[in-house]
């Protein structure tokens, strides 16, 4: 059986029926990976991994007004915490397994919930748990404010070139991925602490993030390639690192555009698989290149060409043919294409910034805490057109 989600979205792009089919496959995948809790997949582990769950929660918030599964996943993360100070990689589970990177994504998932659904009284109760995780990470900071080699499994993506999903790292750490993920999480936590928690903790997190930012460019920037390397010795480069450099604002403006273009064009980089495309596509939008989004859906087109009716865990050879972490188009068709996004906690402000690419006509509706948001765009041959927005009252 599956959790009784009700899809409250609409989407139409005349002449581009492939996009509607992608949404159908994604929603089917998301539904099959949720019953009592979210699951990574319905056949193999059937476990709620918090790295997967961040994406699953965003799919839920963009496609349904039901908050239960999202809030339950966040709470299960808290219930999984151990005395060491981090969450388990997945929960509920009778086996203690730790993916230290997933504890960071768990905090980011809480920030997502705060931004899109609010629930500030509940979120305030989570802040002590977030402090534990961030304090656990703080112990691994070196004097130069770069992380040493973070223990446990630091899974990032099943990318060819990573060792069992872990990024390229040196024995001393010096890992851009570790540092950028920690910076992102610190700044999300600082926003929550400033608004609903302890401003002194917000200041503390911002101080660490600021000092860490000072190490990123000297250690990892390669001006000859217009890219950030994965390690200080520059022995590896990945799309993952450069996507996070854009998302954290380490690179901005024209430089970020160059970095994004190089990240997409240079095939020698370690490539994101379907999971981390969530972050790559967000970086595409953040760099100002969101109009290229439709051109970067090949990994999903390839799976459709194989006849799959759910999204696989990773490109062939894959094990699981149904993995919800690949259903991020069910977020980004609304957030990137239609440009509907939250601009304040609880979705109290709505930002509209479409990236239509080659589309001449597209429309859609998503649920909102106060009702729904609809966007309708039509362009003529000269690229001129109209936009109609229907916003909820209040």
Regions found by a protein language model. Give the residues of each.
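Alpha-helical repeat scaffolds
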Residues: 255-264, 294-297
């Amino acid at each position: 059986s599956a959790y009784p989600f009700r899809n409250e979205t609409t989407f139409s792009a005349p002449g581009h029926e492939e996009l509607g089919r992608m949404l159908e496959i994604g929603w089917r995948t998301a539904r099959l990976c949720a019953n009592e809790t979210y699951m990574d997949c319905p056949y193999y582990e059937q476990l709620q991994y918090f790295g997967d769950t961040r994406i699953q929660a965003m799919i839920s918030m963009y496609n349904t007004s039901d908050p239960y599964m999202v809030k339950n996943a966040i709470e299960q993360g808290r219930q999984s915490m151990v005395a060491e100070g981090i969450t388990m990689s997945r929960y509920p589970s009778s086996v203690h397994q730790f993916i230290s990177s997933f504890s960071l994504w768990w905090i980011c998932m809480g920030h997502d919930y705060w931004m899109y659904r609010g629930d500030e009284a509940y979120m305030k109760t989570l802040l002590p748990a977030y402090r534990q995780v961030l304090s656990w990470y703080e112990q691994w900071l070196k004097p130069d404010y770069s992380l040493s080699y973070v223990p446990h499994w630091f899974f990032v993506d099943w990318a060819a070139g990573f060792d069992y999903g872990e990024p390229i790292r040196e024995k001393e750490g010096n890992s851009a991925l570790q540092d950028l993920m920690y910076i992102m999480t610190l700044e999300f936590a600082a926003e929550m602490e400033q608004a609903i928690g302890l401003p002194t903790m917000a200041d503390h997190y911002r101080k660490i993030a600021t000092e860490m930012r000072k190490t990123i460019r000297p250690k990892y920037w390669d001006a000859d390639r217009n890219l950030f390397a994965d390690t200080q010795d520059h022995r590896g480069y990945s799309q993952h690192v450069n996507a996070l450099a854009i998302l954290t604002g380490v690179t901005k403006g024209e430089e970020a555009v160059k970095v994004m273009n190089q990240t997409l064009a240079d095939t020698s980089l370690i490539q994101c698989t379907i999971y981390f495309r969530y972050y790559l596509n967000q970086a595409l939008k953040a760099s100002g290149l969101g109009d290229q989004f439709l051109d970067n859906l090949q990994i999903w087109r390839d799976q459709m060409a194989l006849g799959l009716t759910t999204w696989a865990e990773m490109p062939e050879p894959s094990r699981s043919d149904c993995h919800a972490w690949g259903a991020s188009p069910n977020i980004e068709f609304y957030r990137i294409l239609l440009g509907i996004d939250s601009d304040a906690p609880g979705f109290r402000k709505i930002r509209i910034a479409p990236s239509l690419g080659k589309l001449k006509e597209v429309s859609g509706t998503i649920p909102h805490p106060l009702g729904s948001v609809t966007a309708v765009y039509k362009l003529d041959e000269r690229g001129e057109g109209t936009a109609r927005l229907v916003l909820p009252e209040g």
